[in-house]
Amino acid sequence: MRRNFIALGLIIALLAAGGCTRRGTNCADPGGTIKIGVYGDLSGQTSSFGQSTKNGTQMAADEINARGGINGRQVQLIHEDDQGEPGKAATVVAKLINQDGVRALIGEVASSNSIAAAPNAQEAKVPMITPSSTNVKVTQIGDYIFRVCFIDPFQGEVMAKFAANTLKAKRAAILFDSNSDYSKGLTRFFQESFIALGGQIVSEQAYAQRDRDFSGQLTQIRSASPDVIYVPGYYQEVGVIAKQAKQLGINAPLMGGDGWDAPQLWDLGGEALNGNYISNHYSVDDPSPAIQKFVADYKAKYNGVAPDAIAALAYDAMMVLGDSITRAGGTECAQLRDAIAATKDFKGVTGVISLNAERNAVKPAVVLELRNRKFLYKETIQPGGIAPAASPAASASPSANTNAPANTNAPSNMNAPANTNARPAGNTNAMGANTSGRNSNMSSTNMNR
């Protein structure tokens, strides 16, 4: 028996050593097709988010491959369904790294799932870019974790400013998901910002994900007579909340974040959603030629479906990754990590993307009004303040970027040989155009899904 334990111990030690060797070997670029793992919810409660992520990343990868790939190498996306569950997200990311041998990861949308999966990427030194997880904790997990979206402190501040300055609200109620890192984070930052602007929180009510009866919480909120109601949840509950609020005679506008942005929201909430507001990453109505080309191409590829913000962010995440691989000269772990971290002034469809020292994107937000099954542009809020306009300012066409190659819809110089002896430089040659500008002096604390 003792010998068996010794033998078992030796086997475990050898396997551990072999695992470390394999992980170390994996840091070297294996050449050939570049495998990228994409994970998201394709069959669970937030499957709309996962499908948009899959569509956006695949569209970007197809465009890259059609132009000859990255330095002559094709890109292969391997999609995994995490069913919207944190534990499953961690499992599929481990599978993508250890079995599929992916060189980088894109995902997730929900912050709780990214927080669960990111430690596996960090430990393996596989760079991970989340398109749309806005909770501040995500990128704090380690230096291989990045995002191309703004973060929750900024998003909460955006709607507090809109409520106080544009809607002239003095009294706000909050209805949040007590099981969601995203919802709890937005609640905190909206509350802090609204109070700092002179507002009062008159009621704060909680619900649990998958709840379908919100009448008790809404009755409490109605009795507090708020001017606005902040509901920082996901679309599958928000649509039901909006309908029940109208049934109870509540006329105060509801406000939320990017978690509302899904086609299914309208099926759940219908006309009860009219006159409510959300913060989001871009507007599909922006007249920028680059954005309108993206929208038209997406509709052509996906049977007339318009790209929501999740799809646009996923597209940008893949394009940022492609550009970073080009500048890194390949997919060696540390070189690719450094190239992503050096991303600067990348002109994506959701705005100009520059990553700060915390690996968060510094960029503005837009406020959209819900009306007749559409998200209508209201105003842009910069990190430094509000920049209202009747409609989004048209961005320069891609050809106006004098630093870019003739085809500015691709990551810069995809087919050119990279200087592998140089530290990756910040990118200024990326696709698209700035949808609403940015403040390069924005504090990293004013930014979070």
Residue ranges and their predicted role:
Residues 242-315, 369-389, 393, 399, ...:
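Extracellular/periplasmic periplasmic-binding protein-like sensory domains
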Residues 301-312, 322-377:
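Segments of small-molecule ligand-sensing domains
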Residues 21-29, 48-53, 63, 67-139, ...:
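Beta-alpha junction/loop-to-helix N-cap segments that form part of ligand/metal-binding clefts
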Residues 27-56, 80-87, 109-112, 175-184, ...:
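Extracytoplasmic "Venus flytrap"
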Residues 89, 148-171, 184-186, 213-215, ...:
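Hydrophobic alpha-helical segments within soluble ligand-binding/sensing domains
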Residues 121, 187-279, 389, 393:
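Extracellular/periplasmic bilobed ligand-binding domains
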Residues 1-35, 385-449:
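Short, low-complexity disordered leader/linker segments with a strong preference
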Residues 145-206, 228, 321:
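An alpha-beta-alpha
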